[in-house]
Amino acid sequence: MKTLDLYGYTSIAQSFDKICISIASPESIRAMSYGEIKDISTTNYRTFKVEKGGLFCPKIFGPVNDDECLCGKYRKKRYRGIVCEKCGVEVTSSKVRRERMGHIELVSPVAHIWFLKSLPSRIGALLDMPLKAIENILYSGDFVVIDPVATPFAKGEVISEVVYNQARDAYGEDGFFALTGVEAIKELLTRLDLEAIRATLRNELESTSSEMKRKKVVKRLRLVENFIKSGNRPEWMILTVIPVLPPDLRPLVSLENGRPAVSDLNHHYRTIINRNNRLEKLLKLNPPAIMIRNEKRMLQEAVDALFDSSRRSYVSSRVGSMGYKKSLSDMLKGKQGRFRQNLLGKRVDYSGRSVIVVGPSLKLHQCGLPKKMALELFKPFICSKLKMYGIAPTVKLANKMIQSEKPDVWDVLDEVIKEHPILLNRAPTLHRLGLQAFDPVLIEGKAIQLHPLVCSAFNADFDGDQMAVHVPLSQEAQLEARVLMMSTNNILSPSNGRPIIVPSKDIVLGIYYLTLLEEDPEVREVQTFAEFSHVEYALHEGIVHTCSRIKYRMQKSAADGTVSSEIVETTPGRLILWQIFPQHKDLTFDLINQVLTVKEITSIVDLVYRSCGQRETVEFSDKLMYLGFKYASQSGISFGCKDMIIPDTKAAHVEDASEKIREFSIQYQDGLITKSERYNKVVDEWSKCTDLIARDMMKAISLCDEKGKYNSIYMMANSGARGSASQMKQLAGMRGLMAKPSGEIIETPIISNFREGLSVFEYFNSTHGARKGLADTALKTANSGYLTRRLVDVAQDCTVVEHDCGTSGGVVARAVIEGGVVVATLDSVVLGRVAAVDTYNPVTGEKLFTSGELIDESKLDKIRVAGLDAVKVRSPLTCESKQGICALCYGRDLAIGDLVSIGEAVGVIAAQSVGEPGTQLTMRTFHVGGTAMRGVEVSNLIALMDATVKLVNSNVVTDKYGNQIVMSRSCEVVLLDAAGNEKMRHSVPYGAKLYATEGQSVSMMEKIAEWDPYTIPIITEKTGTIKYVDLIYGVSINEVLDESTGISNRVVVDWKMHLQGANLRPRLVLLDDNGAVVTLSSDLEASYFVPIGAVLNVQDGQRVHAGDVITRIPRGSIKTRDITGGLPRVIELFEARKPKEHAIVSDVDGYVEFGKDYYRSKRRIFIRPVDKSLPVVEYLVPKGKHTIVNEGDFVHKGDLLMDGDPDQHDILRVLGTEALANYMISEIQQVYRLQGVKIDNKHIEVILRQMLQKVEITEPGDTMYLIGEHVSREEVMKLNRKLAEAGKKEVSYVPILQGITKASLDTNSFISAASFQETTKVLTEAAFAGKEDPLYGLKENVIVGRLIPAGTGFIMNKIKKLAMLDQSDYATYYNSELRGIMGDLGSSIIEEFQTPAPDGSISGSVVDY
């Protein structure tokens, strides 16, 4: 503990448990003050000494110089504590000028602007008066009746000056009591009886039925209760005395030219003192009331400007050309405010920065530090060593020696930096790997050398990037740097658990070349070797080269120790690579007896880590890097223009596509397809053409030349070293389609590639996309950084607090299937999670794992063999720990590959993992040069394996051609394997043709279904005759003539705009041969409602067959998807905003019925529940929106009734927390997956947990809660336990979802919320509620200057609590709180403390320990 007190501050920071904030009473302000300030003088302009009685008065605030009074009579430490009888200054340290407050006694009270102006006005709410009325009383001279006595006025009524004068004439001076100005408000507030108001409001709340009035009453009631609970008095919101900040916090600094630079606060204080003194003199002269009122108003404005000059643009705060003066509020809020600038982001000493260069000869734990920098950074250490060795007798001489760079100094420097790690940081630090520790190696020059393998963690490159160096000073800091932050400890990425120390660029190319197999046409026979030394000799002599095919005798050791050998076909390069592999049974030669690309290399590093541990991995990575660099330079791979081979088939493909597009134009001109359908088809056709050319180009470029050598560019892209297939496509294939800045795709593609060169027109077309990319980057970087900040803020107090919370809850993990393809297997979803229940093999009944067991790589085989399709695992969402989560609910710490440690700050890690790729991706939007990245629309379903078909919800009809047409909106095709396990599940849209029947066997690549992706059809279920109902030409349908084709279509238009269209419900009705309306299988009439924009395919009176398309609704033209579309989506999800056009979700299982329209704009849909006891649910859908259900359809709870994204709040309300979590995870992961970024689900779950912390009270039970109040879930559950024990009625509540910004501001800690956003509002609310900050989170503790309660600080906090206890309680506390973390080591120390001395007393204390 003594070392912690290194800088003397910590003792203050450690000596309290919580911080409370409240409104300061006049008495408390006077008690804090050391004296009243009446004079505006600051310093004497001749002597530059501070003036007595002024704003810098030493008598009030303390001496300017250490231990010296103003007149100079007392000048030494020995006089400390004496007050000079001549000048009245206490002799003490000048530091007190940072702590001692003064005050100004105001002649007239003023209202505090925060309580008056910050909306909603607190003073207004308490008095139940509108803000305008209060302002009129304060500034415009209106009167308020305090006591009506015998007059007809009401108490608290506001009357104008004219009415006041008339009333005074009528009723006399004592007829009634009314006041104006601040005194009136103060009097009203003083007379408030809060207890009586509370009782009245509670009665009102019970009797009122109006929702509006209820909300208003609840707000006022909450305010009144806060005042009662906190012990604040309402009249304290009116100031009669103002505190003055210590002078060293508002200093007077003289500039070079001798002019003083004054802090803005001094200006505000001077204005207040001036106006206050002037008012005091005026009052003695008994002037007219208007003069007094004006002077009081000016005083009020001056005080307002001091507290918050941004609220009203007062003249006083904008003095002439002096510009804006900063107020106290401005000093707190914003990026430059006290919280974010000085408390959360401090500047650090012992640091330097320089440009980085590559250090290929370094080991992973090393970095090259320039000698000049090291000399400066380690100066104090060198000084002490020089003095200790007697080389320099004094510190002054030691400094001189360092400056003149004497030879002795370098020897001492070498000794000092040995085993002393330094920290390297690269801005922006997006995740914790942006700050790592290294052992410094002294180098010449001025640039820092960085190990190539850590570049991806820092996201660094060597094009001029700079990095900062920091020196950890204390022993503890050095220990933490070495044990926790060393680059060798950061092998795995915390966001997905994959290695982040993986080779890239040149290294990959070198290893790829090393494992390549090139067939030399001239070599006929394959050489055979027995030993590696023979291979080396053959290589040296040029008999074989690195990539030749050879045979080699490979020795293999069996588990029992016997050695066997076998002949393998390989290359010398692969054998060279095999020499650096660690020896382990899981690492076989087969791993590298193949061409290694970046993907394989990553999985090898991962496997080495899992099999051999950290040390071996680090050594292996370094060796791998050296090999990669060596062979990349030996390979001679270069980038040549001739290497870009344009495929011969290009012209044919382009011609085919152009031909098809001409066909589409003809179809469009003949009126067979609509404009948007033609556009979509053209875009799709060009996408296909581009892909075909790219495929042929890859085929041509991947072949060896006549000498058996591979193409250099192909090697670079194929190995994953640089470039990608899409970039190669643009170099040698066809650039393809471009996107406009709006995101629309330009339908004329760029047919040329970069090798051929673009025409002027093509070049101009491509500038669109390129510029959009650059503009996007600039805008989105800021967006993504802000998202990360909000995520960190919402999750910062989420740490691992215990091993097991004891819950039996969890979530069901399943494989993720998108578009019929498994994008995340069950293995990858459950890896690193803890099983929530005992899990058995469904066939054999064998127990696979028990509840509470961590599922690691060794257990995954069991899951595969058992063919499980779902596993119930523990989740942060269902964890029941208080103030954090438990280790078992979180599972594996991805950065170390083992169960998470107690004290880990999982919230911050989750926020960084989700936020970091956002920034990365947004910085990279333009990498594909704006070419449109859009997949061809999926229009069919193909079996990807041999399987049996199972149909779910398949309502089909047979059309006139004998095709099976799907009529259900929720039809799914499930493919089962031979054992009957589900392998794939696809939803098939309404109107699709189905080629397979229930139970049919299909073979791989067989087509199961197909549909038109560009339109949504409406299909008849039975045969009959069509009749138009409410489809009136000119009102609800129009013939729309297509200008370019001259063909007209009947299109449904917005009938609400027409006078006659008020009550229309346009629909097509199906009649039988007798003219009666056909009844469908659901017992409903066959009437088909048509939305706005639908194109009618049938005439009135036309005969139709079952399965015919009678109407089609064109889908809008498709926009390109890239992360810039994705990032706002992620933000929308985390902020829990309603999507712009959100879909309506069904609340119950039931049947759909269409009701009568609601006015002109809405359409009624009823759902009649299956459960007859439930009421019918009614929904209002905007007219013209396409409902995806028909009358008579059966819908499940949670199904969508119309197109669009569902609202998350609806999902939570209807389906519950797990369904919401599944929806959010799948939506967020979809965005990241599109960019190839992998994030573990648990990070999203941690953020979600923070968003779900509050509940809404639906029934307060026997408590003081109000209906609709939002309370912390933990608080309610704790209260309910107490109520249950006492046999009282418990509180009922429903979970609510808060966006990350709202959740951050709603946190228990007002310090954390104030430092996030809306500082003044947060502090105002906290003050009148008398809030306490328990200091549980990381942010609050950083702000008050303590160790954070995570990691080492978590344990230190526990030990401090232990130190506070009686020694007899040590063991009990230790066993409950610390044994799980410190084990038996701690208990032996505690026994030592509790061993009685010979006289029976217990000596020693944990504090000493």
Swiss-Prot record:
The RNAP catalytic core consists of 2 alpha, 1 beta, 1 beta' and 1 omega subunit. When a sigma factor is associated with the core the holoenzyme is formed, which can initiate transcription. GO terms for biological process: DNA-templated transcription. DNA-dependent RNA polymerase catalyzes the transcription of DNA into RNA using the four ribonucleoside triphosphates as substrates. Its EC number is 2.7.7.6. Keywords: DNA-directed RNA polymerase, Magnesium, Metal-binding, Nucleotidyltransferase, Transcription, Transferase, Zinc. Zn(2+) 2 binds at C805, C879, C886, C889. The lineage of its organism: Bacteria, Pseudomonadati, Pseudomonadota, Alphaproteobacteria, Rickettsiales. InterPro entries: DNA-dir_RpoC_beta_prime, DNA-dir_RpoC_beta_prime_bact, RNA_pol_asu, RNA_pol_N, RNA_pol_Rpb1_1, RNA_pol_Rpb1_3, RNA_pol_Rpb1_3_sf, RNA_pol_Rpb1_4. Zn(2+) 1 binds at C69, C71, C84, C87. Its cofactor is Mg(2+); Zn(2+). Binds 1 Mg(2+) ion per subunit. Binds 2 Zn(2+) ions per subunit. It catalyses: RNA(n) + a ribonucleoside 5'-triphosphate = RNA(n+1) + diphosphate. It comes from Anaplasma phagocytophilum (strain HZ). One of its GO terms (molecular function) is zinc ion binding. This is DNA-directed RNA polymerase subunit beta'. NCBIfam families: rpoC_TIGR. Belongs to the RNA polymerase beta' chain family. GO terms for cellular component: DNA-directed RNA polymerase complex. Mg(2+) binds at D461, D463, D465. It is an enzyme of class 2 (transferase).
